[in-house]
Amino acid sequence: MKISELSPEYRQPPPHAGLIADLSKAVSDVESFAASATAPEKLAADLRRILTSLASAASSSSFTESLSVQIWRLGTRLWNAVVDRANSAALAGGPAALAVEAEIRQAAPELLLLAGIPNGVPSAAAKVASFFHRSGLAWLDLGRVDLASACFEKATPLVSAAATEDRGVLLELNLARARAASDAGDQALAVALLSRSKPLAAASPEGAKSLAQGYLSIGEATLAAKHSNPAVEASTLFTEALDLCEKAASPSSSSPRTPPYGGATPKTPNLEGLKRRCLRFLALERLQAQDYEGVLRCIRVSRASMGLEEEHPSIGVMAMRAWIGSGNMAEADKELERLMANALATENLCVSAAEAYLAAAGPEAARKVLIALAARCRAGGAAAAVRVVKQVIDGGGGGIGRARAIAELVSDERVVALFDGPGNTHERGTMHALLWNCGTEHFRAKNYDTSADLIERSMLYVSRDEESRSRRADCFRVLSICHIALQHLDRALEFVNEAYKVEPNIKCAFLKVKINLQKGEEDEAFKQMKTMVGCVDFNPEFLTLTAHEAMSCKSFGVAVASLSYLLGLYSAERPMPMPEVAVLRNLIELLSREPGTEAEILKYSRRAKQRMADLGVESFFGSGIVGGRELNWFADLSWNMGLRASKEKKYNFGSEFFELAAEFFSSRNAECDENRSKVCKALIMAVTIMLNAEELNNSPLSDSDIKKGVEMLSRAGKLLPLISPSVPVASDQLEANNFLYLHTFNSYQLMGRMGTPAHPQQLQLIKNFASSKACTPANLLTLGVTASKGALPNMLAAEFSLKACITTALASQSPNYRVISCALRKLACLAGLQDLNGSKSDAAYDVFQQAYQIVVGLKEGEYPVEEGQWLVATAWNMSCLPLRLHQAKVARKWMKMGLDLARHLEGMKERIASMQTTFENLERVSGDEPDECSQEEAPKASISGSMSQPVLV
């Protein structure tokens, strides 16, 4: 048996030994961070667990003195280890890692606070408060204001009633709490904490300096945040900071009742730097408030205590801005020069100040400022120049004067020299872009002279390497366009030639075409257009542009040629800039402005018809309203060209134009009555013009033309009912009647050319027309005259037409006696040429007898004089042949008819006497045989004499 078994251990382990062991192990892990593989997150978790356990144990029973001392020793070791970890670069990490380290740091004062204040530890409460203060600052640096405030609030009660030597910790806590409140946005609390710290700061100059720094820090935050609380003003905070600096610098500021620790005399801190910072921020606050005099006062005070080499660069910037705000540009210029002479001023600050100065001074001062910057900025001179030029450009007012100042500024050799070297490639490109954009703005404003100047200066910043070739060519082309707009055509040609040398392409070729057109050199324009078509980067759109340019220059030939060539490029696969139908329309529109172009217009109209047949109506003209407009344009154009050609007696063209019009009108909306009516009219007009061409050219129609005409009239005949207007309108009805007559007349004409006799059909055609409402006496007269002419006259049709003409005319309310007289004459001539009833004389006599019945009772002058004279003379002369044949009875009948007509017609009164004498002589010679054909009783008076035989008219 072992001794231990005989004498067992009855001693109890100390309380909380397990917690102490865990804590000791955790502290050891924290201390051995270089060799330990324990993750900081695990260390923080272990410490949280231990703190929770200790807090639970402390709540149940108080710690013994020895346990408190143990915890204090371990807490102190933990703090020292945390400090070592913070100083180690091996643990540097991101915000998350720093937050874990801050949590480990805070565990040390938490342990000390749990352990209580043991006896024998000097200033234990102040030490714990200091640890909490530094832990809170760590959280504050990480932006965790809530955790920082919690640390400060735990520390404050520990030292709030501390002895004099520990009051410094309380001051630091108040300043830290003020900073946390400021970061949280509670500026009022921050100011209250600072005010609460004034008695603490009064104990020593260092305390006053710390409080002044606190006021300055809170003032900066207030100024940056532009706090809206009127009770918290940045200027008040800066003034408080200045006052504290003054008190701290005063020898009487240290209280005799607060002797320094160890009996040493307090040393006055160096507050000049802090005072200058306060003055700078106070000047900045006054500058934001636009109190320019206040700014200048602050700067004077600041400068009174320092030399030029010590002046902060912001002083010069604020002084310059204050003088600008006061309107004193001369002093502002001096301040800018002083700033540039300050070695502490960065190049960026100098450029920013120059920008602000130029914004107020205007572009006139830019040259001087930029030259000064060129001398000041060694490394970033090009970037500075870019910023200055941009400020001048963006300074407002894009006038010509500003542009001229920019051009002079960027063309200075010293400025251009800043951009030399490969290191300034970016700045060089930026400067070029600035000038290019400025130039294009003036170009859009049509300030072409100014635009050309700026674009030309921008080329100073374009290198001549291969990469910049395209940019240089663009500049040359824009310069050419500017000079074209200014009508400096020779100069424009020089620039475009340079552009072509740098980068030959279609844009240059087009500009040459444009220049030649404006110079009126059409031959050269033609040559350049051919060159343009042969370019590698040829685009059909440039032919469209050429056509527009040629039209504006009134160069008809070039415009037509460009559109004609463009038309030849259309195919199913190739994308084109505009629809083929639009090209055809523009081309025809151009041709229609010039005389004698009917053949060309007809050619392209035929092409439109053919393409419509090949592609389909919608594929060629387009769909919807736009397509309908295009189609109607071609239809109306064909109709109008047909009318124009007919008016100019170019019947060959006119007929085909009307035929094309019919095709266009019939190609869409076949069910539309209006379109079908137009088709009918166009077909009738086409045949009408065809017959007119035959008559004008005195050449008979070919069999194919006759066949085509018959087909067109047959097609039109089916559509004739659609011509009549749905709403009776006099003008529309008259037009419809005219087309119905033309259809009848043309049909009659073509029937006579068919090669086979068609007299019955012709007669029936006229009868049908005579029975229609469209028939007029004038129409029937024309039909009758036409039927009586030609190689194969249709006498029956002629007689019917003429008789119907007379009947229709007499039946009207206002008979047209000129038409009636013409019909009577033609009918009389017909009667003289044929034997209707076996007796030629009887038929003719019937006509004259009808004429006599018509003229009896007419007013004087109502019947045409010349026609009346013809009737009288013809009737009288009809007696000549019977007299020679000794047919006295027939002769007497005709002489009597002539004499009776003369008595009722105007213009024959002077001849009645001689006619009466001749008639009486005839009766005397032939005996007293009664006249069976007498119309009236013979005159009682005997008239001797003879009447000359009138000529048959």
Swiss-Prot record:
Which residues fall in a compositionally biased region of kind Polar residues?
A: 943-953
Q: Where is this region: Disordered?
A: 248-269, 924-953
Q: Name one GO cellular component term.
A: nucleus
Q: What is its main location?
A: nucleus
Cellular location of this protein? Nucleus; Chromosome
Q: Which UniProt keywords apply?
A: Chromosome, Meiosis, Nucleus, Repeat, TPR repeat
Q: SUPFAM superfamilies, alphabetically?
A: TPR-like
Per the UniProt record, one Pfam family is SPO22
- GO terms under biological process: female meiotic nuclear division; homologous chromosome pairing at meiosis; male meiotic nuclear division; regulation of synaptonemal complex assembly; resolution of DNA recombination intermediates; resolution of meiotic recombination intermediates
Which regions are annotated as TPR repeats? Answer: 129-162, 432-465, 473-506
Q: Reply yes or no: does the keyword Metal-binding apply.
A: no
Functional summary from the UniProt entry: Required for crossover formation, complete synapsis of homologous chromosomes and bivalent formation during meiosis. Is specific to recombination events resulting in interference-sensitive crossovers (class I meiotic crossover) and works cooperatively with MER3 to promote crossovers.
Protein name per its UniProtKB record: TPR repeat-containing protein ZIP4
